């Protein structure tokens, strides 16, 4: 509730409190702290928290979750070096949806970091295959918008950006 209300000082005091320290493991508290820094757009402290958490020896699923979260953050920050390191780790994941996740992360890296536009046909195919999956459609439309922007096609950029925004509102409704 404190995070939703953006009452950051109280939130920080609660996380640092004795009772919270006794009830919740350090990783969970630090992960919550990371999320609060991301919401605050406090990039310096978010970077520090990512460095701390990524340096821990974590169970596989926690590691996968954290690495993908960090990758998305650093791609959004256009941090080529950290994005590339995390993408390399993501490509090493095994099991479940690992291959599909790695492929989508590669598309994000190519689009947002390398500013490529050569994946438009593939992204359009993937969008058709997404069907009624609004979350996936939103993500793919956003990548398509950026690829068209990278290509210099302002009309298509605006078209897919608007579609992505509509799906985003439907997902968050």
In which residue ranges do the predicted regions lie?
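Alpha-helical repeat scaffolds
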Residues: 10-18, 43-55, 79-94, 116-131, ...
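Extracytoplasmic/periplasmic C-terminal soluble domains
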Residues: 103-173
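Residue-level signature for tetratricopeptide repeat
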Residues: 35-39, 72-73, 109-113, 147
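Small-side-chain structural scaffolding
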Residues: 23, 34-36, 46, 83, ...
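N-terminal topogenic membrane-targeting module
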Residues: 1-62
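Amphipathic coiled-coil alpha-helices
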Residues: 2, 14, 49, 67, ...
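A membrane-cytosol interface segment of integral membrane proteins
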Residues: 60-84
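Generic helix N-cap/helix-start motif at coil->alpha-helix transitions
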Residues: 1, 22-31, 59-68, 95-107, ...
């Amino acid at each position: 509730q404190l995070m939703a209300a953006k009452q950051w000082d109280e939130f920080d005091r609660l996380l640092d409190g004795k009772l919270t320290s006794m009830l919740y493991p350090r990783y969970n508290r630090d992960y919550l702290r990371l999320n609060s820094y991301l919401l605050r757009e406090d990039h310096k402290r978010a970077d520090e928290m990512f460095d701390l958490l990524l340096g821990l020896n974590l169970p596989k699923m926690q590691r996968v979750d954290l690495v993908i979260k960090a990758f998305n953050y650093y791609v959004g920050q256009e941090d080529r070096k950290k994005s590339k390191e995390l993408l390399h780790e993501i490509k090493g994941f095994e099991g479940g949806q690992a291959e599909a996740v790695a492929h989508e992360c590669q598309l994000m890296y190519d689009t947002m970091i390398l500013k490529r536009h050569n994946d438009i046909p593939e992204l359009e195919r993937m969008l058709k295959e997404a069907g009624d999956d609004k979350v996936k459609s939103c993500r793919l439309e956003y990548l398509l918008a950026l690829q068209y922007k990278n290509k210099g096609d302002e009309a298509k950029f605006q078209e897919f950006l608007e579609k992505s925004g509509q799906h985003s509102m439907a997902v968050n409704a």
